[in-house]
């Protein structure tokens, strides 16, 4: 199977996984990226089974609306039953690196507000140690130099992501050459740097379930 076929398979698996949760008042959190887009397309086939969605980016909100799926502001809903999103990397503890699509802050907020976080990915994203994929850090623009210097002290090699402005009006530093042996500790350390909005480690609030598309089929990993 190609990577695109694996992504399609895991999007279908995610829809099958969450379908028993769907009721007339259910709110579904929806992530951002190529795999999340395929999940949105699957979700559209069942849009009569639930109330609506909360999206983690303007791009996902636009795709949902094109399918006729209601998109609510997070502040207008009481709870999110389940959040489905992809990842750039996952370890065996379901700690993730996310943010390749620059939506990490809103993704982290939606994940924090959700009863269950279902991560969907293909087998290439499962690693023993996080850090091969550069860690995105969303920053206040004026703090870029300061944050970069602090990230170097942590052992990383930060690179400014040229031409990218997040939905929140901020910039992204991608941090290379990190061997992330303690994801929770590093997430806290980076978030403690003045000028950082958040970073792409989802370790404090990790995924609850990882649906992993492999050439042998879908594997389900749980915490």
From Swiss-Prot:
Q: SUPFAM superfamilies under this entry?
A: D-ribose-5-phosphate isomerase (RpiA), lid domain (SSF75445), NagB/RpiA/CoA transferase-like (SSF100950)
Signal peptide limits: none
Protein family according to the UniProt entry: Belongs to the ribose 5-phosphate isomerase family.
* Oligomeric and partner information: Homodimer.
Quick check: keyword Kinase in the entry? no
Biological processes per GO annotation: D-ribose metabolic process; pentose-phosphate shunt, non-oxidative branch
What is the protein's known function?
A: Catalyzes the reversible conversion of ribose-5-phosphate to ribulose 5-phosphate.
What would be an example GO MF term here?
ribose-5-phosphate isomerase activity
Q: Name one Pfam family in it.
A: Rib_5-P_isom_A
- Please give the name of this protein: Ribose-5-phosphate isomerase A
């Amino acid at each position: 199977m190609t990577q695109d076929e694996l992504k399609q398979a895991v999007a279908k698996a995610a829809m099958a996984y969450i379908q028993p949760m769907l009721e007339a008042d259910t709110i579904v959190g929806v992530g951002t990226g190529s795999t999340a887009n395929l999940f949105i397309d699957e979700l559209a086939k069942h849009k009569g089974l639930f109330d609506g969605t909360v999206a983690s980016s303007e791009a996902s909100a636009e795709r949902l609306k094109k399918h006729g799926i209601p998109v609510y502001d997070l502040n207008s809903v009481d709870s999110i039953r389940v959040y489905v999103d992809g990842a750039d990397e996952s370890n065996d503890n379901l700690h993730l690196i996310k943010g390749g699509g620059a939506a990490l802050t809103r993704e982290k907020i939606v994940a924090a507000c959700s009863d269950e976080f279902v991560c969907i990915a293909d087998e290439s994203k499962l690693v023993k140690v996080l850090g091969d994929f550069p860690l995105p850090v969303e920053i206040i623009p004026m703090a870029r130099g300061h944050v970069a210097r602090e990230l170097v002290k942590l052992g990383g090699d930060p690179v400014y992501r040229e031409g990218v402005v997040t939905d929140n009006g901020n910039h992204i530093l991608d941090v290379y050459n990190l061997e992330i042996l303690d994801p929770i500790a590093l997430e806290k350390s980076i978030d403690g740097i003045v000028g950082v909005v958040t970073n792409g480690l989802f370790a404090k609030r990790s995924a609850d379930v990882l649906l992993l598309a492999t050439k042998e089929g879908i594997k389900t990993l749980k915490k």
